[in-house]
Amino acid sequence: MTPISPETRQFINEHQSDDVRNLALQARKYPDVDIPAAITQIAGRQIAAEKIPSWKEIDDIWYPKHLSLEQCSSEITARYKASLLQGESLADLTGGFGIDCSFLATGFRSATYVERQTELCAIAAHNFPALDLNHISVRNDDGVAYLEAMSPVDCIFLDPARRNEHGGKTVAISDCEPNVAKLEGLLLSKANRIMIKLSPMLDLSQALKELPHTQEVHIISVNNECKELLLLLGQTAPEEIP
């Protein structure tokens, strides 16, 4: 990501509550400002005020394009996930914007963020130090490729992409990327504890058949709306799942 100029940063700070559509129409008035970059950051701050309130006052946070941010976790759900995992080392194999990783990492001595999109990696590499999370290393790599080569860690987190080739929401693990059902054995050879975040639209009974080492199921609701389904896998396959 290209560094933000002082002029653009000042523009962002002065217009962070303004309508971004109106700002886009006024681009000619600000020849020294990178308007597309400014609009991305202003829109990001406005969404963060609702989704990630603890980041709102940190001026040095960079935000990704709108679609990526809409798909990311909220602070409420990220903090809940962080309450479930602690240890020495963590690997987040589907890093994205890095919200989940940033909160999960607070419970670990070291963490690795893995993401195949170069722009998101650049944003994460900038944001983690701004959040005083200097113990997170950033890897621009495919999550499965990294998994195959990585050394064992205490915990692994995955948030498989839940959209099919037509952009619609999916309800089967086999429609997600990566297909965690096919990776269960490899995942458990690399970590004692695996957390998988899935769509609440998932066919849960089928998912439990495909992931027999699931030890816990957590359904996260915010304001009476089901937001996420979490599966926690361990080394032993339980007889019953709490």
Protein language model annotation of sequence segments:
Residues 1-18, 25, 157, 162-242:
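Class I S-adenosyl-L-methionine
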Residues 88, 109, 154, 192:
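Conserved acidic residues
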Residues 110-115:
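Conserved SAM-binding motif I beta-strand of class I
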Residues 97-109:
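Conserved SAM-binding loop of SAM-dependent methyltransferases across substrates and taxa
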Residues 1-88, 116-155:
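S-adenosyl-L-methionine
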Residues 88-96:
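Conserved class I S-adenosyl-L-methionine
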